[in-house]
Protein backbone atom coordinates (compact mmCIF):
# COMPACT_ATOMS: atom_id res chain seq x y z
CA UNK A 1 0.00 0.00 0.00
CA UNK A 2 2.90 2.33 -0.74
CA UNK A 3 4.07 2.37 2.88
CA UNK A 4 0.87 4.06 4.01
CA UNK A 5 -0.04 3.24 7.59
CA UNK A 6 -3.63 2.72 8.55
CA UNK A 7 -4.88 2.99 12.09
CA UNK A 8 -7.30 0.33 13.24
CA UNK A 9 -10.72 1.87 13.64
CA UNK A 10 -12.56 1.35 16.92
CA UNK A 11 -15.84 -0.52 16.74
CA UNK A 12 -18.37 2.18 15.96
CA UNK A 13 -22.10 2.05 16.74
CA UNK A 14 -24.23 0.62 13.93
CA UNK A 15 -26.97 3.28 13.85
CA UNK A 16 -27.07 7.02 13.36
CA UNK A 17 -28.85 7.52 16.69
CA UNK A 18 -26.27 5.55 18.68
CA UNK A 19 -23.44 7.51 17.07
CA UNK A 20 -25.07 10.84 17.94
CA UNK A 21 -25.72 9.62 21.50
CA UNK A 22 -22.06 8.59 21.75
CA UNK A 23 -21.14 12.22 21.06
CA UNK A 24 -23.51 13.22 23.87
CA UNK A 25 -21.62 10.92 26.25
CA UNK A 26 -18.30 12.48 25.28
CA UNK A 27 -19.33 16.16 25.20
CA UNK A 28 -22.74 16.63 26.83
CA UNK A 29 -22.44 20.41 27.20
CA UNK A 30 -21.44 21.13 23.60
CA UNK A 31 -24.05 22.71 21.32
CA UNK A 32 -25.37 20.16 18.83
CA UNK A 33 -27.95 22.15 16.85
CA UNK A 34 -29.18 25.70 16.53
CA UNK A 35 -30.66 28.03 13.96
CA UNK A 36 -28.79 30.83 12.22
CA UNK A 37 -30.59 33.36 14.42
CA UNK A 38 -29.48 31.56 17.59
CA UNK A 39 -32.86 30.07 18.47
CA UNK A 40 -33.75 26.40 19.04
CA UNK A 41 -30.28 25.75 20.43
CA UNK A 42 -29.75 22.27 21.86
CA UNK A 43 -26.76 20.93 23.73
CA UNK A 44 -25.99 17.30 23.08
CA UNK A 45 -27.42 16.25 26.47
CA UNK A 46 -30.54 18.29 25.75
CA UNK A 47 -30.86 16.69 22.34
CA UNK A 48 -30.87 13.26 24.00
CA UNK A 49 -33.66 14.35 26.35
CA UNK A 50 -35.73 15.93 23.59
CA UNK A 51 -35.38 12.82 21.42
CA UNK A 52 -36.60 10.68 24.30
CA UNK A 53 -39.55 12.97 25.00
CA UNK A 54 -40.70 13.19 21.40
CA UNK A 55 -40.27 9.44 20.95
CA UNK A 56 -42.49 8.91 23.99
CA UNK A 57 -45.15 11.15 22.41
CA UNK A 58 -45.01 9.09 19.23
CA UNK A 59 -45.13 5.82 21.15
CA UNK A 60 -48.26 7.04 22.92
CA UNK A 61 -49.82 7.39 19.45
CA UNK A 62 -49.01 3.75 18.64
CA UNK A 63 -46.00 4.57 16.46
CA UNK A 64 -43.61 1.62 16.51
CA UNK A 65 -40.85 -0.06 14.55
CA UNK A 66 -41.51 0.16 10.81
CA UNK A 67 -44.17 2.87 11.13
CA UNK A 68 -43.81 5.76 8.73
CA UNK A 69 -43.86 9.23 10.28
CA UNK A 70 -44.28 12.25 8.04
CA UNK A 71 -41.74 14.93 9.05
CA UNK A 72 -42.93 18.33 7.84
CA UNK A 73 -39.58 20.10 7.64
CA UNK A 74 -38.46 23.69 8.07
CA UNK A 75 -34.76 22.65 7.96
CA UNK A 76 -34.27 23.71 11.57
CA UNK A 77 -33.17 21.72 14.64
CA UNK A 78 -36.73 20.50 15.21
CA UNK A 79 -36.58 18.69 11.86
CA UNK A 80 -33.46 16.74 12.82
CA UNK A 81 -34.84 16.13 16.31
CA UNK A 82 -37.86 14.56 14.61
CA UNK A 83 -35.69 12.23 12.53
CA UNK A 84 -33.80 11.04 15.61
CA UNK A 85 -37.01 10.57 17.61
CA UNK A 86 -38.33 8.31 14.86
CA UNK A 87 -35.04 6.40 14.98
CA UNK A 88 -35.47 5.87 18.73
CA UNK A 89 -38.57 3.79 17.94
CA UNK A 90 -37.31 2.19 14.75
CA UNK A 91 -39.88 4.23 12.82
CA UNK A 92 -39.06 5.70 9.41
CA UNK A 93 -38.91 9.48 8.95
CA UNK A 94 -40.66 10.47 5.71
CA UNK A 95 -39.17 13.84 4.79
CA UNK A 96 -41.51 16.48 3.33
CA UNK A 97 -40.78 20.17 2.73
CA UNK A 98 -43.08 22.31 4.84
CA UNK A 99 -43.56 24.77 1.99
CA UNK A 100 -44.83 22.22 -0.51
CA UNK A 101 -48.36 22.59 -1.88
CA UNK A 102 -50.98 20.63 0.03
CA UNK A 103 -51.54 18.40 -3.01
CA UNK A 104 -47.89 17.27 -2.89
CA UNK A 105 -48.11 16.48 0.84
CA UNK A 106 -51.25 14.46 0.23
CA UNK A 107 -49.55 12.54 -2.58
CA UNK A 108 -46.66 11.69 -0.25
CA UNK A 109 -49.19 10.39 2.26
CA UNK A 110 -50.83 8.21 -0.38
CA UNK A 111 -47.46 6.64 -1.19
CA UNK A 112 -46.19 6.08 2.37
CA UNK A 113 -49.35 5.74 4.54
CA UNK A 114 -47.88 7.49 7.61
CA UNK A 115 -48.98 6.60 11.14
CA UNK A 116 -48.33 10.14 12.42
CA UNK A 117 -46.97 13.51 11.38
CA UNK A 118 -44.43 15.79 13.06
CA UNK A 119 -44.63 19.46 12.13
CA UNK A 120 -41.63 21.78 12.55
CA UNK A 121 -42.51 25.29 13.77
CA UNK A 122 -41.24 27.17 10.72
CA UNK A 123 -43.17 25.15 8.15
CA UNK A 124 -46.19 26.59 6.38
CA UNK A 125 -48.38 23.89 7.88
CA UNK A 126 -47.54 25.07 11.40
CA UNK A 127 -49.68 28.17 10.82
CA UNK A 128 -52.30 26.88 8.40
CA UNK A 129 -54.97 24.24 8.09
CA UNK A 130 -53.88 20.61 8.22
CA UNK A 131 -54.30 18.83 4.87
CA UNK A 132 -57.21 16.43 4.64
CA UNK A 133 -54.86 13.47 4.23
CA UNK A 134 -53.61 14.05 7.80
CA UNK A 135 -57.04 14.27 9.45
CA UNK A 136 -57.04 10.56 10.28
CA UNK A 137 -53.62 10.45 11.98
CA UNK A 138 -52.11 12.25 14.99
CA UNK A 139 -50.31 15.47 14.10
CA UNK A 140 -47.72 16.64 16.63
CA UNK A 141 -46.24 20.14 16.63
CA UNK A 142 -42.54 19.84 17.45
CA UNK A 143 -41.39 22.54 19.83
CA UNK A 144 -38.23 22.73 21.87
CA UNK A 145 -39.73 24.01 25.11
CA UNK A 146 -37.70 26.62 26.98
CA UNK A 147 -38.48 24.95 30.30
CA UNK A 148 -37.00 21.71 28.99
CA UNK A 149 -33.87 23.40 27.71
CA UNK A 150 -33.25 25.20 30.98
CA UNK A 151 -33.55 22.08 33.13
CA UNK A 152 -30.61 19.85 33.98
CA UNK A 153 -30.66 16.57 32.10
CA UNK A 154 -28.69 13.66 33.46
CA UNK A 155 -27.41 11.25 30.86
CA UNK A 156 -28.24 7.91 32.42
CA UNK A 157 -28.17 4.57 30.66
CA UNK A 158 -31.90 4.68 29.97
CA UNK A 159 -31.84 8.07 28.23
CA UNK A 160 -28.80 7.12 26.15
CA UNK A 161 -30.24 3.79 25.07
CA UNK A 162 -30.87 3.68 21.35
CA UNK A 163 -32.87 0.87 19.82
CA UNK A 164 -31.23 -2.47 20.48
CA UNK A 165 -33.17 -4.08 17.66
CA UNK A 166 -31.81 -1.65 15.06
CA UNK A 167 -28.69 -2.04 12.96
CA UNK A 168 -26.93 -0.53 9.98
CA UNK A 169 -29.29 -2.18 7.47
CA UNK A 170 -32.47 -0.94 9.12
CA UNK A 171 -34.25 1.99 7.45
CA UNK A 172 -33.87 5.47 8.90
CA UNK A 173 -35.56 7.84 6.45
CA UNK A 174 -37.31 8.29 3.13
CA UNK A 175 -36.55 11.09 0.72
CA UNK A 176 -38.67 11.83 -2.32
CA UNK A 177 -36.61 12.20 -5.46
CA UNK A 178 -36.77 15.74 -6.78
CA UNK A 179 -36.04 14.85 -10.39
CA UNK A 180 -36.95 17.11 -13.26
CA UNK A 181 -39.91 15.05 -14.44
CA UNK A 182 -41.95 12.02 -13.49
CA UNK A 183 -43.88 10.52 -10.58
CA UNK A 184 -42.34 11.07 -7.12
CA UNK A 185 -40.55 8.05 -5.69
CA UNK A 186 -39.79 7.52 -2.00
CA UNK A 187 -36.13 6.51 -1.66
CA UNK A 188 -35.74 4.28 1.39
CA UNK A 189 -32.40 4.88 3.12
CA UNK A 190 -30.74 2.69 5.74
CA UNK A 191 -28.69 3.88 8.70
CA UNK A 192 -25.51 2.87 6.85
CA UNK A 193 -26.26 5.41 4.12
CA UNK A 194 -25.24 8.21 6.47
CA UNK A 195 -21.93 6.87 7.73
CA UNK A 196 -20.58 4.35 5.19
CA UNK A 197 -18.54 6.88 3.19
CA UNK A 198 -17.21 8.84 6.21
CA UNK A 199 -16.11 5.51 7.72
CA UNK A 200 -14.27 4.67 4.49
CA UNK A 201 -12.47 8.02 4.49
CA UNK A 202 -11.40 7.56 8.11
CA UNK A 203 -10.27 3.98 7.55
CA UNK A 204 -8.25 4.89 4.46
CA UNK A 205 -6.75 8.02 6.00
CA UNK A 206 -8.13 10.25 3.23
CA UNK A 207 -8.78 13.95 3.74
CA UNK A 208 -11.16 14.42 0.80
CA UNK A 209 -13.93 15.49 3.19
CA UNK A 210 -13.19 15.79 6.90
CA UNK A 211 -15.07 16.53 10.11
CA UNK A 212 -13.60 17.90 13.34
CA UNK A 213 -15.21 17.60 16.77
CA UNK A 214 -16.55 20.96 17.91
CA UNK A 215 -16.34 22.65 14.50
CA UNK A 216 -19.31 24.66 13.30
CA UNK A 217 -21.00 23.60 10.09
CA UNK A 218 -23.81 25.32 8.19
CA UNK A 219 -26.19 23.75 5.72
CA UNK A 220 -28.55 25.81 3.58
CA UNK A 221 -29.61 22.61 1.81
CA UNK A 222 -33.10 21.27 2.55
CA UNK A 223 -33.39 18.39 4.99
CA UNK A 224 -35.79 16.88 2.48
CA UNK A 225 -32.94 16.38 0.00
CA UNK A 226 -30.15 13.88 0.49
CA UNK A 227 -27.42 16.53 0.61
CA UNK A 228 -28.95 18.44 3.51
CA UNK A 229 -29.99 15.43 5.58
CA UNK A 230 -26.70 13.59 4.99
CA UNK A 231 -24.53 16.61 5.79
CA UNK A 232 -26.16 17.52 9.11
CA UNK A 233 -26.54 13.96 10.39
CA UNK A 234 -22.92 13.24 9.48
CA UNK A 235 -21.72 16.32 11.34
CA UNK A 236 -23.82 15.38 14.39
CA UNK A 237 -22.24 11.92 14.37
CA UNK A 238 -18.83 13.63 14.43
CA UNK A 239 -19.63 15.97 17.31
CA UNK A 240 -20.04 19.17 15.33
CA UNK A 241 -22.11 22.27 16.03
CA UNK A 242 -24.74 22.22 13.29
CA UNK A 243 -26.29 25.51 12.22
CA UNK A 244 -29.36 24.94 10.08
CA UNK A 245 -32.54 26.86 9.31
CA UNK A 246 -33.60 30.19 10.79
CA UNK A 247 -31.84 32.31 8.19
CA UNK A 248 -32.43 35.97 9.08
CA UNK A 249 -30.52 37.31 6.10
CA UNK A 250 -30.11 36.36 2.45
CA UNK A 251 -26.36 36.96 2.67
CA UNK A 252 -24.32 33.76 2.77
CA UNK A 253 -21.25 35.77 3.66
CA UNK A 254 -23.01 37.23 6.71
CA UNK A 255 -24.26 33.82 7.87
CA UNK A 256 -20.85 32.19 7.53
CA UNK A 257 -19.03 35.06 9.22
CA UNK A 258 -21.48 35.68 12.07
CA UNK A 259 -21.62 31.99 12.97
CA UNK A 260 -17.87 31.38 12.54
CA UNK A 261 -18.62 28.52 10.17
CA UNK A 262 -15.77 26.11 9.40
CA UNK A 263 -17.50 23.81 6.90
CA UNK A 264 -20.48 24.09 4.60
CA UNK A 265 -22.05 22.26 1.68
CA UNK A 266 -23.61 24.17 -1.21
CA UNK A 267 -25.17 23.63 -4.59
CA UNK A 268 -23.24 25.41 -7.38
CA UNK A 269 -25.76 28.26 -7.63
CA UNK A 270 -25.16 29.07 -3.95
CA UNK A 271 -21.42 28.73 -4.46
CA UNK A 272 -21.68 31.36 -7.20
CA UNK A 273 -23.69 33.59 -4.86
CA UNK A 274 -21.03 33.29 -2.16
CA UNK A 275 -18.24 34.14 -4.61
CA UNK A 276 -20.18 37.18 -5.81
CA UNK A 277 -20.60 38.41 -2.23
CA UNK A 278 -16.95 37.85 -1.38
CA UNK A 279 -15.86 39.80 -4.45
CA UNK A 280 -18.28 42.66 -3.82
CA UNK A 281 -17.22 43.01 -0.19
CA UNK A 282 -13.55 42.28 -0.89
CA UNK A 283 -13.81 39.92 2.07
CA UNK A 284 -12.93 36.44 3.26
CA UNK A 285 -14.42 34.14 5.90
CA UNK A 286 -11.53 33.57 8.34
CA UNK A 287 -13.16 30.57 10.02
CA UNK A 288 -13.99 28.74 6.78
CA UNK A 289 -11.95 25.58 6.17
CA UNK A 290 -13.94 23.42 3.73
CA UNK A 291 -16.68 23.95 1.15
CA UNK A 292 -18.38 20.87 -0.23
CA UNK A 293 -20.52 21.29 -3.32
CA UNK A 294 -22.56 19.16 -5.69
CA UNK A 295 -25.98 18.55 -7.19
CA UNK A 296 -25.11 19.94 -10.61
CA UNK A 297 -22.05 21.02 -12.59
CA UNK A 298 -20.03 23.75 -10.91
CA UNK A 299 -18.39 26.77 -12.50
CA UNK A 300 -14.64 26.24 -12.34
CA UNK A 301 -13.93 29.95 -11.83
CA UNK A 302 -15.99 29.90 -8.62
CA UNK A 303 -14.06 26.93 -7.25
CA UNK A 304 -10.76 28.56 -8.22
CA UNK A 305 -11.73 31.74 -6.36
CA UNK A 306 -12.69 29.88 -3.18
CA UNK A 307 -9.50 27.83 -3.20
CA UNK A 308 -7.41 30.98 -3.74
CA UNK A 309 -8.62 32.19 -0.32
CA UNK A 310 -7.04 29.14 1.30
CA UNK A 311 -10.25 27.14 1.65
CA UNK A 312 -10.33 23.50 0.58
CA UNK A 313 -13.17 22.31 -1.64
CA UNK A 314 -14.67 18.94 -2.43
CA UNK A 315 -17.05 18.27 -5.29
CA UNK A 316 -19.33 15.36 -4.41
CA UNK A 317 -21.31 13.36 -6.95
CA UNK A 318 -24.18 11.06 -6.18
CA UNK A 319 -27.94 10.67 -6.04
CA UNK A 320 -30.49 10.10 -3.32
CA UNK A 321 -30.38 6.48 -4.48
CA UNK A 322 -26.61 6.23 -3.90
CA UNK A 323 -26.68 7.83 -0.47
CA UNK A 324 -25.51 11.32 -1.42
CA UNK A 325 -21.88 10.88 -2.47
CA UNK A 326 -20.20 8.06 -4.39
CA UNK A 327 -17.54 10.03 -6.31
CA UNK A 328 -15.46 12.95 -5.10
CA UNK A 329 -13.13 15.58 -6.56
CA UNK A 330 -11.23 17.27 -3.72
CA UNK A 331 -8.74 20.12 -3.90
CA UNK A 332 -5.64 18.76 -5.61
CA UNK A 333 -3.08 19.60 -8.27
CA UNK A 334 -4.96 19.92 -11.53
CA UNK A 335 -8.42 19.76 -9.96
CA UNK A 336 -9.52 23.07 -11.48
CA UNK A 337 -8.59 21.92 -14.99
CA UNK A 338 -10.59 18.76 -14.41
CA UNK A 339 -13.63 20.75 -13.26
CA UNK A 340 -13.40 22.89 -16.40
CA UNK A 341 -13.52 19.69 -18.45
CA UNK A 342 -16.63 18.46 -16.61
CA UNK A 343 -15.09 16.06 -14.08
CA UNK A 344 -17.20 15.00 -11.11
CA UNK A 345 -14.49 12.98 -9.37
CA UNK A 346 -13.47 9.40 -8.80
CA UNK A 347 -15.05 6.76 -6.58
CA UNK A 348 -14.22 6.39 -2.91
CA UNK A 349 -12.37 3.20 -1.97
CA UNK A 350 -14.94 0.46 -1.57
CA UNK A 351 -17.33 2.03 -4.09
CA UNK A 352 -17.56 0.12 -7.38
CA UNK A 353 -18.54 1.80 -10.64
CA UNK A 354 -19.44 0.50 -14.08
CA UNK A 355 -20.12 2.29 -17.36
CA UNK A 356 -22.69 0.46 -19.46
CA UNK A 357 -22.29 0.97 -23.19
CA UNK A 358 -25.86 -0.27 -23.69
CA UNK A 359 -28.49 1.58 -21.67
CA UNK A 360 -30.25 -0.66 -19.15
CA UNK A 361 -27.67 -3.46 -19.37
CA UNK A 362 -25.93 -3.49 -16.00
CA UNK A 363 -22.72 -5.16 -14.84
CA UNK A 364 -24.44 -8.36 -13.68
CA UNK A 365 -26.62 -8.84 -16.76
CA UNK A 366 -26.00 -11.99 -18.83
CA UNK A 367 -23.29 -11.30 -21.36
CA UNK A 368 -22.29 -7.96 -19.83
CA UNK A 369 -18.82 -6.93 -20.91
CA UNK A 370 -16.18 -4.95 -19.03
CA UNK A 371 -16.85 -1.37 -18.04
CA UNK A 372 -16.84 0.93 -21.08
CA UNK A 373 -15.02 4.23 -21.38
CA UNK A 374 -18.35 5.98 -21.99
CA UNK A 375 -21.84 5.02 -20.97
CA UNK A 376 -24.52 4.97 -18.30
CA UNK A 377 -23.05 4.94 -14.79
CA UNK A 378 -23.91 2.13 -12.39
CA UNK A 379 -22.78 2.37 -8.75
CA UNK A 380 -22.37 -0.28 -6.07
CA UNK A 381 -21.80 1.53 -2.80
CA UNK A 382 -22.23 0.57 0.86
CA UNK A 383 -24.37 3.71 1.07
CA UNK A 384 -26.84 2.68 -1.67
CA UNK A 385 -30.57 2.83 -1.00
CA UNK A 386 -32.68 -0.11 0.14
CA UNK A 387 -35.12 0.57 -2.69
CA UNK A 388 -38.16 2.67 -3.54
CA UNK A 389 -40.90 2.37 -0.95
CA UNK A 390 -43.86 0.31 -2.11
CA UNK A 391 -42.62 0.42 -5.71
CA UNK A 392 -41.08 -2.98 -6.51
CA UNK A 393 -41.30 -2.51 -10.28
CA UNK A 394 -39.26 0.67 -10.32
CA UNK A 395 -36.86 -0.71 -7.71
CA UNK A 396 -36.21 -3.73 -9.92
CA UNK A 397 -35.35 -1.42 -12.81
CA UNK A 398 -32.91 0.78 -10.87
CA UNK A 399 -31.42 -1.44 -8.14
CA UNK A 400 -30.07 -4.74 -9.51
CA UNK A 401 -27.84 -7.05 -7.46
CA UNK A 402 -26.76 -4.13 -5.29
CA UNK A 403 -25.97 -1.86 -8.27
CA UNK A 404 -27.84 1.43 -8.81
CA UNK A 405 -28.42 2.59 -12.37
CA UNK A 406 -27.88 6.35 -12.06
CA UNK A 407 -29.17 7.16 -15.54
CA UNK A 408 -26.25 9.58 -15.91
CA UNK A 409 -23.90 9.45 -18.88
CA UNK A 410 -20.24 9.66 -17.93
CA UNK A 411 -16.86 9.25 -19.56
CA UNK A 412 -13.91 7.65 -17.80
CA UNK A 413 -10.59 9.08 -18.92
CA UNK A 414 -7.06 7.80 -18.57
CA UNK A 415 -6.53 9.97 -15.47
CA UNK A 416 -9.03 7.75 -13.63
CA UNK A 417 -11.57 10.55 -13.21
CA UNK A 418 -15.14 10.52 -14.44
CA UNK A 419 -16.61 13.31 -16.56
CA UNK A 420 -20.36 13.93 -16.72
CA UNK A 421 -22.05 14.23 -20.10
CA UNK A 422 -25.71 14.39 -19.08
CA UNK A 423 -28.61 12.05 -18.39
CA UNK A 424 -29.47 9.25 -20.76
CA UNK A 425 -33.12 10.35 -20.62
CA UNK A 426 -32.10 13.87 -21.71
CA UNK A 427 -29.99 12.87 -24.70
CA UNK A 428 -30.82 14.95 -27.75
CA UNK A 429 -30.88 12.77 -30.87
CA UNK A 430 -30.18 14.97 -33.87
CA UNK A 431 -30.03 13.27 -37.24
CA UNK A 432 -29.28 9.97 -35.53
CA UNK A 433 -26.42 11.45 -33.50
CA UNK A 434 -26.61 11.33 -29.68
CA UNK A 435 -25.89 14.77 -28.20
CA UNK A 436 -24.90 14.85 -24.50
CA UNK A 437 -26.46 17.97 -22.91
CA UNK A 438 -23.77 18.55 -20.30
CA UNK A 439 -21.09 18.63 -22.99
CA UNK A 440 -23.02 21.33 -24.86
CA UNK A 441 -23.41 23.29 -21.61
CA UNK A 442 -19.70 22.96 -20.84
CA UNK A 443 -18.57 24.29 -24.21
CA UNK A 444 -20.86 27.32 -23.92
CA UNK A 445 -19.75 28.10 -20.37
CA UNK A 446 -16.16 28.19 -21.58
CA UNK A 447 -16.90 31.39 -23.51
CA UNK A 448 -15.84 34.63 -21.85
CA UNK A 449 -18.95 36.58 -20.88
CA UNK A 450 -21.11 33.51 -20.22
CA UNK A 451 -22.12 32.98 -16.60
CA UNK A 452 -24.33 29.91 -17.08
CA UNK A 453 -25.58 27.90 -20.01
CA UNK A 454 -27.99 25.05 -20.57
CA UNK A 455 -29.17 23.39 -23.74
CA UNK A 456 -32.60 22.01 -24.57
CA UNK A 457 -34.30 20.05 -27.31
CA UNK A 458 -36.16 21.66 -30.22
CA UNK A 459 -38.39 19.26 -32.21
CA UNK A 460 -37.53 19.25 -35.91
CA UNK A 461 -39.23 17.40 -38.77
CA UNK A 462 -36.05 16.86 -40.76
CA UNK A 463 -33.54 15.92 -38.05
CA UNK A 464 -35.87 14.73 -35.29
CA UNK A 465 -34.46 17.34 -32.93
CA UNK A 466 -32.16 20.34 -32.89
CA UNK A 467 -30.12 21.83 -30.07
CA UNK A 468 -31.29 25.05 -28.46
CA UNK A 469 -29.07 26.93 -26.03
CA UNK A 470 -30.02 29.33 -23.23
CA UNK A 471 -27.29 31.55 -21.83
CA UNK A 472 -27.04 33.78 -18.76
CA UNK A 473 -24.54 36.54 -19.48
CA UNK A 474 -21.97 37.64 -16.91
CA UNK A 475 -23.10 41.26 -17.22
CA UNK A 476 -26.05 43.20 -18.58
CA UNK A 477 -25.81 43.53 -22.36
CA UNK A 478 -27.28 45.87 -24.91
CA UNK A 479 -28.58 44.48 -28.21
CA UNK A 480 -25.26 44.83 -29.99
CA UNK A 481 -23.27 43.18 -27.21
CA UNK A 482 -25.81 40.37 -26.95
CA UNK A 483 -25.54 39.64 -30.66
CA UNK A 484 -21.73 39.68 -30.45
CA UNK A 485 -21.78 37.21 -27.55
CA UNK A 486 -24.04 34.84 -29.46
CA UNK A 487 -21.74 34.88 -32.47
CA UNK A 488 -18.74 34.23 -30.20
CA UNK A 489 -20.55 31.23 -28.73
CA UNK A 490 -21.43 29.93 -32.19
CA UNK A 491 -17.80 30.30 -33.27
CA UNK A 492 -16.60 28.25 -30.32
CA UNK A 493 -19.01 25.45 -31.20
CA UNK A 494 -17.73 25.47 -34.78
CA UNK A 495 -14.23 24.92 -33.38
CA UNK A 496 -14.99 22.36 -30.67
CA UNK A 497 -18.09 20.31 -31.49
CA UNK A 498 -19.47 18.12 -34.20
CA UNK A 499 -22.00 19.83 -36.50
CA UNK A 500 -25.09 18.17 -35.00
CA UNK A 501 -24.20 19.42 -31.49
CA UNK A 502 -24.01 23.06 -32.54
CA UNK A 503 -26.95 25.12 -31.25
CA UNK A 504 -29.41 26.15 -33.93
CA UNK A 505 -30.86 28.74 -31.57
CA UNK A 506 -29.14 30.79 -28.88
CA UNK A 507 -31.18 32.88 -26.47
CA UNK A 508 -29.92 35.06 -23.63
CA UNK A 509 -32.02 34.68 -20.49
CA UNK A 510 -31.95 36.14 -16.99
CA UNK A 511 -31.88 32.75 -15.26
CA UNK A 512 -32.03 29.03 -15.91
CA UNK A 513 -34.78 27.01 -14.20
CA UNK A 514 -33.36 24.47 -11.76
CA UNK A 515 -34.58 22.05 -9.12
CA UNK A 516 -33.75 22.70 -5.45
CA UNK A 517 -30.68 20.53 -5.85
CA UNK A 518 -29.46 22.63 -8.78
CA UNK A 519 -30.28 20.34 -11.70
CA UNK A 520 -31.39 22.02 -14.93
CA UNK A 521 -35.10 21.65 -15.70
CA UNK A 522 -34.62 21.27 -19.43
CA UNK A 523 -38.29 20.78 -20.30
CA UNK A 524 -39.21 24.03 -18.52
CA UNK A 525 -36.27 25.75 -20.16
CA UNK A 526 -37.40 24.60 -23.61
CA UNK A 527 -40.93 25.90 -23.02
CA UNK A 528 -39.70 29.27 -21.77
CA UNK A 529 -37.10 29.71 -24.50
CA UNK A 530 -39.53 28.74 -27.25
CA UNK A 531 -41.99 31.33 -25.98
CA UNK A 532 -39.34 34.06 -26.05
CA UNK A 533 -40.12 35.95 -29.22
CA UNK A 534 -37.08 38.18 -28.78
CA UNK A 535 -34.58 35.39 -29.35
CA UNK A 536 -31.98 35.67 -32.06
CA UNK A 537 -31.38 32.63 -34.23
CA UNK A 538 -27.75 31.87 -34.99
CA UNK A 539 -27.00 29.20 -37.56
CA UNK A 540 -23.59 27.65 -37.43
Curated annotation (Swiss-Prot):
Mg(2+) binds at residues 177, 321. It is found in: Cytoplasm. ATP binds at residues 226, 316, 320, 408. The keyword Disulfide bond does not apply. It comes from Mycobacterium tuberculosis (strain ATCC 25618 / H37Rv). Its cofactor is Mg(2+). Retains a single open conformational state for both the apo- and ligand-bound forms. Dodecanoyl-AMP binds at residues 315-316, 408. NCBIfam families: PRK05857.1. Pathway: Lipid metabolism; fatty acid metabolism. It comes from the Bacteria. PROSITE patterns: AMP_BINDING. Keywords: ATP-binding, Cytoplasm, Fatty acid metabolism, Ligase, Lipid metabolism, Magnesium, Metal-binding, Nucleotide-binding. The keyword rRNA-binding does not apply. This is Medium/long-chain-fatty-acid--[acyl-carrier-protein] ligase FadD10. Homodimer. The gene is fadD10. Induction: Repressed by CRP. Acyl:acyl-carrier protein ligase involved in the biosynthesis of a unique class of isonitrile lipopeptides (INLPs) that seem to function as virulence factors in M.tuberculosis and to play a role in metal acquisition. Catalyzes the activation of medium/long-chain fatty acids as acyl-adenylates (acyl-AMP), which are then transferred to the phosphopantetheine arm of the acyl-carrier protein (ACP) Rv0100. Can use octanoate (C8), decanoate (C10), dodecanoate (C12), tetradecanoate (C14) and hexadecanoate (C16), but not hexanoate (C6) in vitro. One of its GO terms (biological process) is fatty acid metabolic process. Its EC number is 6.2.1.20, 6.2.1.47. Its main location: cytoplasm. InterPro entries: AMP-bd_C, AMP-bd_C_sf, AMP-binding_CS, AMP-dep_synth/lig_dom, ANL_N_sf, ATP-dep_AMP-bd_enzyme. One of its GO terms (molecular function) is ATP binding. Belongs to the ATP-dependent AMP-binding enzyme family. It catalyses: a medium-chain fatty acid + holo-[ACP] + ATP = a medium-chain fatty acyl-[ACP] + AMP + diphosphate; a medium-chain fatty acid + ATP + H(+) = a medium-chain fatty acyl-AMP + diphosphate; a medium-chain fatty acyl-AMP + holo-[ACP] = a medium-chain fatty acyl-[ACP] + AMP + H(+); a long-chain fatty acid + holo-[ACP] + ATP = a long-chain fatty acyl-[ACP] + AMP + diphosphate. Disruption phenotype: Cells lacking this gene are shown to be highly attenuated in a mouse tuberculosis model. GO terms for cellular component: cytoplasm; plasma membrane.
